[in-house]
C-alpha cells in the first residue's frame, strides 16, 4: 500500500491501543510505536538514492521478510523504552509486532507484492486485488479516524471498519476471478494461454489485464465484465543463442527479470550498428505507453555501453535517463 494508507492504519491502531491499560498512560509513545511500526518496513525506500536497480531489487524484499518482520518490532521496542522509560516493553513490542505484520500483510494484496515468506522462498507474493492506493480503503480509514477524534469509542468505530474491509477484500477477489474468466474466454478462442495477469486500478470497476499465450501477448483493460485488449504483439522466441542471454548478467536486466512476473522483450538495430534490447513489463500499460522497462545497448563486441531500469512515462525521458548513466 501507499504511505498515506499505512499512516492511516497506524493511526487506527493507535486508537485501538489506547484501550490497552498498559499503553493508555503514554499516548505519545503509543502513537510513535504504531505509526512507526506501520511505516518502518518501507525504510528501504532510501535505496533509491543509490540507483533504481538496487531499489527495485530490495524494495518490499528483505525488509518485508520473516526475519525483519520479527526484528523491526524488537528495534522499535528498544528505542521506545530508551526514550519513554515508563512504558511496558512487552505491550509496546506486542503492538509494534501487530503494526509491522499488518504492513507486510496488506502489501501482498497489490500487484507489486512482497517477499513476505523469505527466506523460506524468494517468490514475490502478488495477489493483485487491491491497488497500491485504494481510495475506498483510505476514505473509510479516514472517516474512522475522524469519528474517533470527535469522541466515539475506538472499538465502536474500528471493529465495524475491519468487518467492512474484510467484506470489501472478498468482493475484490470475486471481481478479479470474474474478470480473469472473461479474459480467458476471449483468448482461448485463438490461442492457448500460458500466463494471466489481472490487477486493479485506482478506479473500482477498471482492471488491468495481460495474457501471454504460446504465440502472442495481449494487454488491455476490463471495464466491469467487459474486457478490451488494446495491444496484441507476436511473442519473440527465446533460444539459448538469443542475445538476451548475453545481457542477463547486467544489473539492470537481471533486476528486471527477477522482479517482473509477466513481460516481453524485443530487439532493435540502432543507427551505429549496436543492438537495443528492451524488456517491457506488461503490467504497466497506460495511455499506450509501457512505463516499467529495462533497456540495454549492446555493441558489436557484445559490450553493454548503456543500460537503465525504472518507471518512465515518455520515450524522450527514457532516452535521457538511459544516456545520463
Residue ranges and their predicted role:
Residues 182-325:
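C-terminal regulatory/interaction regions
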Residues 1-186, 191-200, 210-214:
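N-terminal membrane-targeting hydrophobic helices
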Amino acid at each position: 500500500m501507499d504511505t498515506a494508507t499505512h499512516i492511516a492504519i497506524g493511526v487506527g491502531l493507535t486508537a485501538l491501543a489506547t484501550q490497552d491499560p498498559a499503553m493508555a498512560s503514554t499516548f505519545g509513545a503509543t502513537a510513535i510505536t504504531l505509526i512507526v511500526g506501520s511505516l518502518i518496513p518501507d525504510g528501504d525506500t532510501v535505496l533509491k538514492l543509490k540507483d533504481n536497480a538496487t531499489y527495485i531489487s530490495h524494495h518490499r524484499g528483505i525488509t518485508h521478510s520473516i526475519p525483519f518482520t520479527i526484528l523491526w518490532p524488537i528495534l522499535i521496542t528498544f528505542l521506545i523504552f530508551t526514550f519513554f522509560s515508563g512504558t511496558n516493553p512487552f505491550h509496546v513490542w506486542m503492538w509494534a509486532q501487530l503494526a509491522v505484520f499488518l504492513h507486510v500483510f496488506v502489501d501482498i494484496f497489490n500487484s507489486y507484492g512482497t517477499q513476505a515468506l523469505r527466506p523460506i522462498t524468494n517468490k514475490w507474493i502478488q495477489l493483485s486485488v487491491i491497488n497500491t492506493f485504494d481510495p475506498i480503503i483510505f476514505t473509510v480509514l479516514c472517516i474512522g479516524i475522524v469519528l474517533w477524534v470527535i469522541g466515539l469509542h475506538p472499538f465502536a468505530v474500528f471493529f465495524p471498519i475491519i468487518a467492512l474491509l474484510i467484506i470489501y477484500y472478498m468482493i475484490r477477489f470475486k471481481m478479479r476471478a470474474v474478470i480473469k474468466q472473461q479474459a480467458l474466454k476471449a483468448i482461448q478462442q485463438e490461442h492457448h494461454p500460458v500466463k494471466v495477469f489481472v490487477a486493479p486500478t485506482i478506479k473500482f470497476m477498471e482492471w488491468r489485464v495481460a495474457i501471454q499465450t504460446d504465440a502472442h501477448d495481449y494487454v488491455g483493460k476490463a471495464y466491469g465484465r467487459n474486457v478490451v485488449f488494446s495491444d496484441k504483439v507476436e511473442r519473440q522466441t527465446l533460444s539459448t543463442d538469443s542475445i538476451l542471454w548475453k545481457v542477463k548478467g547486467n544489473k539492470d536486466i537481471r533486476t528486471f527479470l527477477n522482479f517482473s512476473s509477466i513481460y516481453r522483450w524485443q530487439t532493435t538495430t540502432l543507427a551505429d550498428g549496436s543492438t537495443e534490447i528492451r524488456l517491457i513489463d506488461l503490467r504497466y500499460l497506460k495511455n499506450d505507453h509501457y512505463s516499467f522497462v529495462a533497456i540495454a545497448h549492446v555493441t558489436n563486441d557484445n559490450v553493454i555501453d548503456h543500460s537503465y531500469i525504472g518507471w518512465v512515462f515518455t520515450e524522450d525521458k527514457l532516452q535521457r535517463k538511459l544516456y545520463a548513466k
